[in-house]
C-alpha cells in the first residue's frame, strides 16, 4: 500500500498511484480495471486485487465504501454535467471526496480545464458510444490506416491537454499496438485487444450478468450470474405469489404474526367505545 494525500488533502492508503501506473506502462506490466456500480461489486473487485475500479461520479461514495484502498476513477457522464461550470464543479466534488482520477468523454478543452486544476484526468477515444452514429453504427474503428492516424491524433491532443491516460474503446488490436508506440498516455483497452496497458472490462460482462443488450464481441464471461439471478427471481416470484394467496385465503396474518391487547384491556376498550 502507498500513502498518499487525496485531492482533498486527506491522508489515505492506495493499492496503486498514477506514478505506479505510468511506471508499469513503461515496464510493460499489464494492469486490470473493472467497472463497479455499488459497494457490493466494489468489495468483490477489491477482494480479488484488481488494480483499478472505474465508476460513475454519482456512485463514487458507495463504491468507495466497498473498496477503501483501491485506485478509483470517477467518470463524469456527459449528460450529467453539461456546461464547463457544471463539469468543473462535478469533478471537484468527486475528487475532494477521494477519487483518484476523473474520466471525461468531452472536448480536449474540458480535459485541459480539469488538468490545469491539478486533477489526474483521462480522456476517451476510439468508438465513443455517443459517437457511434458517426461511424455508421457500433463497430471497431481503426481498421484503416487513416482511422488509426485519426485516433493517434486524438491521443496526442489529449497529451497536450494534460491527460495522463485514455480509455481506448473498440479499436483494431494491431492498430493500437502500433500507435501506442507514439503516445505517452496510459492506454485502458476496452475491446481494443492486448495493446493496452490496462485491460478493462465491465463487471456484468465478466460475471455473466449482461442483460438487455447483445454481449459485446470483446467481452468474456468467467461466471454465470444470470443463471443465479433467474433462480433468485423465481424464488422471489413464488414468495410474492404466496403472500397474495395467503392474504386472499385469510391465512395471513394469523396469531403467529399479530399481538393482542393486554388481559382485560379489550373489554375496557369495548366499554369505552360504547360510551364514545
Task: Report each predicted region and the residues it spans.
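Alpha/beta enzyme core
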Residues: 1-276
